[in-house]
């Protein structure tokens, strides 16, 4: 049994919380987490030597019997970390005020949308947000535990690979508001089917509906609209009546705030060599300029604007904030090298994000185009079908260069062979080929699942 009051009082003495003994700077509360291939309990005493104030360990670990008063024994360190985070989320302010938390999930665009929302809300508020994509059962509690007395709003990203992941994370984060960016065919190995994806992501809506929370819903998306309608009573008007203000619609148990390109009457402008990034025109002649590659990011931008408007950020302020966001970590980045223009989206890939990236490549104005694509992982029995769909799409585009990497694309090529496609077993093999066969004067999409590491090819482009 975890004595959460005692644990919380000790946490309040610490500078921060960490699960990485290598990150100890002094004064932290260290949690020794145990996974399939590691055991952080083994580093607990070392963490104390390095300056951690306390170390939380499993009660059956060697460190638990060390006799060091700074060692706190619990039945399960991960459960303790999550319980501490939930308690901190509920007791952030000594005067009893409740911190407003915005929860975010979705198949694609979670991290980009989270960063855009944070940038927009920071115009008016002190915002604590998930760092990077620390959105799992460890990252979410660590994000919550970084909240301090100065925090006015928290934006928490939640990821999922398995059916009940979101249900567990909302119990820790207890969001007051929620937004699902989209639902797509990803992690099918864990979810079983697209319906499984919708059920899993919809657990955010389930929590909000059960706790009188508020959902931001992109009503341009039929899947999200249907998922919201299953939980709240609201209708989508055929003709949007309010072009620039998200319209709250009282549901059975909580409000729904609608947004979308059509509701905002936002128009995505064509890209060009002079304007390669996403741009949108809003009513009244307002221009939204971004540093994001890909028209598919338009819904992420509109989501951030909608959230900002609801929390009192003006439209002009929101547009300015969006324009300052520069993506990183190979997410929707566009870079001009000495030889090529690169659309770097190599952080991850699934069927829906791959199709969207290829659709965007069609819209890009360029004389010569290419695509370097890596396998999409965790698709289970649907893998060959989904890779064949991507292969068919890319072959229909008439690209000047198509390079595919991985065993799943090899299986697709066995079904539909093409002499115009170059296949490689690994990103290292493709990198070696690019070094021996330099490519220049081309706009190139680089995308694949994280494990394929397509970013290794970038230095040769």
Name these PLM-found stretches:
Residues 2-103, 112-123, 145, 414, ...:
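Short, basic phosphate-binding NTP loop
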Residues 28, 47, 84, 104, ...:
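Residue-level signal for inorganic ion chemistry
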Residues 33-38, 327-330, 346-419:
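Active-site beta-alpha connecting loops in nucleotide-dependent enzymes
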Residues 44, 166, 201, 205, ...:
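Generic hydrophobic/aromatic pocket-lining and core-packing "Φ" positions
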Residues 44, 48-49, 170-171, 362, ...:
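Non-catalytic positions within long, well-ordered alpha-helices that form the structural scaffold/packing
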Residues 79-219, 223-232, 242-252, 308, ...:
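Phosphate-binding loop of NTP-binding sites
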Residues 104, 110, 329-332, 451, ...:
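ATP-dependent carboxylate/acyl-activation modules
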């Amino acid at each position: 049994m975890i004595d959460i009051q005692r644990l919380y009082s000790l946490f309040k003495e610490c500078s921060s919380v960490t699960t990485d003994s290598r990150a100890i700077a002094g004064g932290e509360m260290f949690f020794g987490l145990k996974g399939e291939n590691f055991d952080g309990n083994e580093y607990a005493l070392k963490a104390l030597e390095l300056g951690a104030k306390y170390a939380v360990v499993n009660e059956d670990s060697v460190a638990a019997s060390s006799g060091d008063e700074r060692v706190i024994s619990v039945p399960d360190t991960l459960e303790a970390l999550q319980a501490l985070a939930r308690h901190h989320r509920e007791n952030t302010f000594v005067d009893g005020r409740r911190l407003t938390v915005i929860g975010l999930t979705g198949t694609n665009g979670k991290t980009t949308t989270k960063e855009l929302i944070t940038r927009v809300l920071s115009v008016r508020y002190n915002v604590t947000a998930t760092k990077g994509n620390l959105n799992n059962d460890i990252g979410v509690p660590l994000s919550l535990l970084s909240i301090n007395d100065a925090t006015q709003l928290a934006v928490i990203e939640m990821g999922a690979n398995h059916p009940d992941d979101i249900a567990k994370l909302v119990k820790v984060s207890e969001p007051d508001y929620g937004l699902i960016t989209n639902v797509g065919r990803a992690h099918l190995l864990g979810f079983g089917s697209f319906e499984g994806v919708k059920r899993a992501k919809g657990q955010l809506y389930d929590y909000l509906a059960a706790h009188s929370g508020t959902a931001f819903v992109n009503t341009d998306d039929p899947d999200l609209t249907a998922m919201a309608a299953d939980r709240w009573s609201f209708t989508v008007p055929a003709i949007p009546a309010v072009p620039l203000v998200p319209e709250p619609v009282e549901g059975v148990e909580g409000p729904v705030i609608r947004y979308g390109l059509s509701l905002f009457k936002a128009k995505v402008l064509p890209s060009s060599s002079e304007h390669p990034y996403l741009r949108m025109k809003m009513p009244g002649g307002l221009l939204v300029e971004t540093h994001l590659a890909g028209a598919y990011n338009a819904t992420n931008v509109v989501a951030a604007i909608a959230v900002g408007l609801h929390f009192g950020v003006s439209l002009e302020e929101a547009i300015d904030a969006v324009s300052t966001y520069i993506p990183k970590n190979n997410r929707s980045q566009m870079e001009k090298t000495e030889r090529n223009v690169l659309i770097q989206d190599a952080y991850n890939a699934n069927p829906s994000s791959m199709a969207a990236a290829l659709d965007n490549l069609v819209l890009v104005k360029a004389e010569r185009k290419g695509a370097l694509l890596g396998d999409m992982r965790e698709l289970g029995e649907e893998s060959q079908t989904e890779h064949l769909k991507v292969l068919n799409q890319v072959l229909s585009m008439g690209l000047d260069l198509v390079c595919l990497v991985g065993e799943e694309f090899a299986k697709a090529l066995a079904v539909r062979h093409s002499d115009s496609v170059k296949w490689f077993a690994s990103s290292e093999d493709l990198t070696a080929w690019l070094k021996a066969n330099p490519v220049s004067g081309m706009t190139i999409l680089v995308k694949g699942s994280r494990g394929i590491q397509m970013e290794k090819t970038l230095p040769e482009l």
